[in-house]
Amino acid sequence: VARQIDFGAVSTPFDSLPAAEAVAVHPIQDTFVCGRRFISYKHRTLDLSVLGELPLICLEGDTSTRRYMDAFLEQNHASVHPEFELATSDMIVQFALRNLGVGCVVRDFALPHLQSGKLFELRFNKIIPKREICIVRNTKNPMSTAAKNLWTIIENAQQKKENTL
């Protein structure tokens, strides 16, 4: 018997199925980070087209983050050709720390280095829309007892969070 997963974590936007139920659990912000090599860009508000002139470090093309950023940049007429396409966001941060280029990552991955001042974020005249990490399940598939309990905890935590806003 083929076993289905109970639920998974995905980032928005995603193609939803009719039987899918999603709970947004964490907002995420995509950003471009770099080190001292690019200090001349630090206090400037840039046009997104500048990214076409910089050595970009991005995730590989088959990720939802990469597809999202490619679509955002295309909508804003910014043509980019990454210098490096890496498998993980952690690797992108490490390349940016070594001044090998400007990394495109979810801000959470670079946060410790942004707070320490080892990296800084580029600022643009267009705001990159925030996204969400969601827990998604197929309502047609029965969940195990443990999965049901965890799903309830996730839903309750999210409702509590929404009520405090």
Model region roles, listed by residue range:
Residues A19-I57, G61:
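Flexible hinge/capping segments at coil-to-helix
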Residues F120-E162:
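A late-sequence structural motif
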Residues T12-P13, R36, R107-F109, N125-K126, ...:
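Short secondary-structure boundary segments
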Residues V1-D30, C34, L97, L122:
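Short beta-strand-centered segments that line the small-molecule binding cleft or hinge
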Residues S40-Y41, P55-N76, M143-A147, W151, ...:
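Secondary-structure junction motif
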Residues F14-D15, F38, T65, M91, ...:
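Alpha-helix capping/helix-boundary segments
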Residues V1-Q4, S11, D70-E121:
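Hydrophobic hinge/microswitch elements
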